[in-house]
């Protein structure tokens, strides 16, 4: 018999928010009797941009900006109905993107 598994992937620009959200999800799942594997930190993606400081001349003078996207991965093995209900009612911060897959 195959076990059901919920895979949760979190993405955010702020690592503090994503760690706080991951801790809330783990606490909620453990309270309802599910087994949690993770959170596993995935590689941080850095996107860099070069922007000209001057609108007219001085091509060599540029600003460098970057956006870092932090990611975490969690697996909830054998979730109960209580676990699914508790995860649906969970209120996470606005800056965290959550992807949930049933496997």
Swiss-Prot record:
Keywords: Ribonucleoprotein, Ribosomal protein
Keyword Zinc-finger: no
Gene Ontology cellular component list: ribonucleoprotein complex; ribosome
Origin: domain of life: Bacteria
Entry GO MF terms: structural constituent of ribosome; tRNA binding
Any single GO BP term: translation
Complex formation: Part of the 30S ribosomal subunit.
HAMAP family noted in UniProt: Ribosomal_uS10 (MF_00508)
Family: Belongs to the universal ribosomal protein uS10 family.
Protein's job: Involved in the binding of tRNA to the ribosomes.
Name assigned to this protein: Small ribosomal subunit protein uS10
Organism annotation: Verminephrobacter eiseniae (strain EF01-2)
